[in-house]
A protein has these predicted regions:
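Bacterial N-terminal signal peptides that target proteins for export
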Residues: 1-11
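Structured extracytoplasmic
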Residues: 26-217, 224-230, 235-253, 258-270, ...
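Generic short N-terminal amphipathic or hydrophobic helices
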Residues: 2-3, 15, 34-37
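Bacterial N-terminal signal peptides
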Residues: 9-20
Length: 313
C-alpha cells in the first residue's frame, strides 16, 4: 500500500478478489533453481447428479491458484518493470474534468520494492526532478547497504508478520463465497475457466478484516493448464466503511485486473482498471477512473546488489 486515500481503496479491492497480488510468500531463495517447480493443476470439474459443480471443487481450484501466487511473488522480486498510471478525475455526472499520468520504474533494492518516477503526463522529468528521484533511490540503497544484522532481522520479522495477516485474509476468500461455473473463454490464446462468485449467505468471518468480503461479487478467469488467474472482474454490491469511518467505499465501485505469463516462468500484472467512488474522512470525495498498465519486465541476477544508482555488484 503506497499512500492513503484513493490508492488505499484500490489496494483493498485488488486484495479481495485477485487471489492475490499480495498473498503470502516465503523469504526469497537466492537462487531461482531453489524455487520449486510448479506442478500441473488437477483441473477437472466433476458435476454432481444434478449437473452442478460442487462448491468443494471450486474451493480446491481457487486454493490451488492462491498457492501459485506464492511462487509468483517469489519470482517477482527478480524483476524490474515499468508501471504507467492514468487517473481521470470525474465530475458529479461522471464526465472527465482532468487527466493525469505518472510513469514509474519499479526496482528491487535489498528485497524492497522502490519506485522511481520517470515521466509525468507522458513527458520526461526535468533535470531537477530526475535528480530528486535519483537521490531518493540512493537514500534507500544507503539505508540497507549499512543495515545492521539486528535491524535486518527485525525488518524481516515485521514483513513476515504482515504476510501472515495477508495470508489469513486470502485463505478465507474460497470459503466466503458461493461459486458457479459460467463457462470457458479464450484469453490471449489461453483456455480459461470462467467462475462467478457471490457472498455465501450465513458465512461467519474468521477475521475482523474479512467482514468486508460480503460486500463484493465478481468473476475470475483461471487458466485451465496452469491454474493461474488470468483476469478478474469485481464489483462492490454495498457501501463499505473502512478504518473507523476514515474511508467509505460506495456501492458500485468496480475493478478489473489482468495478468500475463512472463519469460515462460511467472505470471505478473498486466493491467488494472478501477472506478473509484469513495469518501475519505467523511470530507473529501474521490470520483475517479484509474488505469494502470505494467510493462518492460526485466529479470536481473538474484545475487546482484545495487550499491549505487545505476550500479550493481
Amino acid at each position: 500500500m503506497r499512500i492513503i486515500g484513493m490508492r488505499f481503496c484500490c489496494f483493498l479491492l485488488v486484495l479481495i478478489f485477485r487471489v492475490s497480488f499480495v498473498s503470502s510468500e516465503q523469504p526469497r531463495a537466492s537462487d531461482p533453481s531453489q524455487i520449486p517447480a510448479i506442478p500441473q493443476p488437477p483441473i477437472t470439474f466433476q458435476p454432481d447428479p444434478s449437473g452442478a459443480v460442487p462448491q468443494a471443487q471450486f474451493r480446491e481450484l481457487l486454493r490451488y491458484a492462491q498457492d501459485r501466487e506464492v511462487e509468483n511473488e517469489k519470482r517477482l522480486r527478480d524483476y524490474t518493470y515499468v508501471e504507467r498510471e492514468e487517473e481521470h478525475k470525474l465530475d458529479g455526472s461522471g464526465n472527465v474534468k482532468k487527466t493525469e499520468t505518472r510513469t514509474r520504474e519499479v526496482l528491487q533494492v535489498y528485497g524492497e520494492e522502490v519506485e522511481r518516477l520517470i515521466a509525468k503526463d507522458d513527458k520526461p522529468l526535468s533535470d531537477a526532478e530526475s535528480k530528486k528521484e535519483e537521490e531518493k533511490i540512493q537514500k534507500v540503497i544507503n539505508k540497507y547497504k549499512n543495515e545492521s544484522e539486528s535491524s535486518r532481522r527485525k525488518r524481516l520479522e515485521k514483513e513476515e508478520k504482515e504476510r501472515q495477516e495477508e495470508r489469513k485474509f486470502v485463505l478465507e476468500i474460497a470459503d466466503a463465497f458461493n461459486f458457479r461455473l459460467v463457462g470457458s473463454e479464450t484469453l490471449d490464446g489461453r483456455e480459461t475457466w470462467v467462475i462467478e462468485g457471490e457472498p455465501r449467505a450465513g458465512y461467519e468471518p474468521k477475521e475482523r478484516s474479512t467482514k468486508i468480503l460480503s460486500k463484493f461479487k465478481g468473476r475470475v478467469w483461471i487458466d485451465k493448464t496452469e491454474g493461474q488467474w488470468v483476469r478478474l472482474d469485481i464489483t462492490a454490491i454495498d457501501s463499505i466503511s473502512v478504518g473507523w469511518f476514515l474511508a467509505r467505499i460506495h456501492k458500485g465501485m468496480h475493478i478489473e485486473a489482468e495478468q500475463t505469463k512472463i519469460n515462460d516462468e511467472v505470471w505478473l500484472p498486466k493491467h488494472v482498471a478501477v472506478r473509484v467512488d469513495a469518501r475519505l474522512a467523511l470530507l473529501k470525495s474521490y470520483n475517479e477512473d484509474v488505469d494502470e498498465t505494467f510493462r518492460d519486465y526485466k529479470k536481473f541476477r538474484t545475487e546482484s546488489k545495487i550499491t549505487a544508482v545505476g550500479e550493481t555488484q
